[in-house]
Amino acid sequence: GFPIPDPYGWDPSFRTFYSIIDDEHKTLFNGIFHLAIDDNADNLGELRRCTGKHFLNQEVLMQASQYQFYDEHKKAHEEFIRALDNWKGDVKWAKSWLVNHIKTIDFKYKGKI
């Protein structure tokens, strides 16, 4: 996979060039960062809320543009939500998932939605 930024945070290498998606990705990085600092129910709940909102927004854009990899992308989102819902405090896994999801899966829709 891709290297995990240290310090952990969004940087221009994660830019999809869709401002709403990039802004939401920044929020997700912040959510995972806060969870890494303090693994508590409030931080987990906030990350879950922001993640659900972001995935819904992204999926609506994909459906509207008939993005060909929509099903694969939605499945990746569902797997992450399941993992959050079954959270065991694995912050390292969450950091890695977001970095690799954006750079591998999200970048496929650059210029297509």
From Swiss-Prot:
One of its GO terms (molecular function) is iron ion binding. Fe cation 1 binds at residues 25, 54, 58, 106. Signal peptide: none annotated. Disulfide bonds: none annotated. Keywords: Iron, Metal-binding, Oxygen transport, Transport. Gene3D superfamilies: Hemerythrin-like. InterPro entries: Haemerythrin (IPR002063), Haemerythrin_Fe_BS (IPR016131), Hemerythrin (IPR050669), Hemerythrin-like (IPR012312), Hemerythrin-like_sf (IPR035938), Hemerythrin_metal-bd (IPR012827). The keyword Iron applies. It comes from the Eukaryota. Fe cation 2 binds at residues 58, 73, 77, 101, 106. Belongs to the hemerythrin family. Hemerythrin is a respiratory protein in blood cells of certain marine worms. The oxygen-binding site in each chain contains two iron atoms. PANTHER family: BACTERIOHEMERYTHRIN. Homooctamer. This is Hemerythrin. It comes from Themiste hennahi (Peanut worm). The lineage of its organism: Eukaryota, Metazoa, Spiralia, Lophotrochozoa, Annelida.
